[in-house]
UniProtKB/Swiss-Prot annotation:
Gene Ontology cellular component list: cytosol
UniProt GO MF annotations: tryptophan synthase activity
Its job: The alpha subunit is responsible for the aldol cleavage of indoleglycerol phosphate to indole and glyceraldehyde 3-phosphate.
EC code: 4.2.1.20
CDD domains in alphabetical order: Tryptophan_synthase_alpha (cd04724)
Segment forming the signal sequence: none
Keywords on record: Amino-acid biosynthesis, Aromatic amino acid biosynthesis, Lyase, Tryptophan biosynthesis
The species this protein was found in: Escherichia coli (strain SE11)
UniProt name for this protein: Tryptophan synthase alpha chain
Catalytic activity line of the entry: (1S,2R)-1-C-(indol-3-yl)glycerol 3-phosphate + L-serine = D-glyceraldehyde 3-phosphate + L-tryptophan + H2O
Catalytic residues, chain numbering: 49 (proton acceptor), 60 (proton acceptor)
Enzyme class label: lyase
InterPro entries with a match to the protein in the record: Aldolase_TIM, RibuloseP-bd_barrel, Trp_synthase_alpha_AS, Trp_synthase_suA
Amino acid sequence: MERYESLFAQLKERKEGAFVPFVTLGDPGIEQSLKIIDTLIEAGADALELGIPFSDPLADGPTIQNATLRAFAAGVTPAQCFEMLALIRQKHPTIPIGLLMYANLVFNKGIDEFYAQCEKVGVDSVLVADVPIEESAPFRQAALRHNVAPIFICPPNADDDLLRQIASYGRGYTYLLSRAGVTGAENRAALPLNHLVAKLKEYNAAPPLQGFGISAPDQVKAAIDAGAAGAISGSAIVKIIEQHINEPEKMLAALKVFVQPMKAATRS
């Protein structure tokens, strides 16, 4: 959890925002997935947002669903994902690692046991995509017991009450939704969310990172200009993996070419 605090403090000092890529663990296979993550970090990723393959991903558009299917085809299990997380943490001791999850995967383990395992391998945050804030108590309490930041989604239409709850319960960062709907780079992020950012600041929420539909450097810059602490890009990155599925080296090179200007756009 503290890794987010020190990251945001360092970025503030350097007058930079955070660029955070999302990928599915084990896509397209364990070995290449670990290389992908190393490449993202080398190219300038400030933190990682990682998915564990799940058979019914509700919030995901077709691109990320395909990533999940590729990981399943490679036989990747949640247990192997945790082994991967331990390896990533060993190699990269300071980078914040967040998981984007669905409740079933947390329940399968038992809520407390799941967060205990996160703590053990060095996961900093968990966002459970299909648990609304009013049902989040058992998740966020277990998270805090194990020094894992509970992350909450702030939708574009959030009312004052929801903004206060997000500020009060969330830690690490706040996932600021560019728009309602499922993830995907096709639907470019809508207008900057200045009013939400201002309200979240007023209520002392964890720094907002804007996600959903972020696929170009100008969108990263727009998010930061609107007051967000950074941007999360998932589908655009997963698409690169898909496009170069049979050319592992080309894939890594293309990921680097995508991430470098995205990170550069965070520098004011």
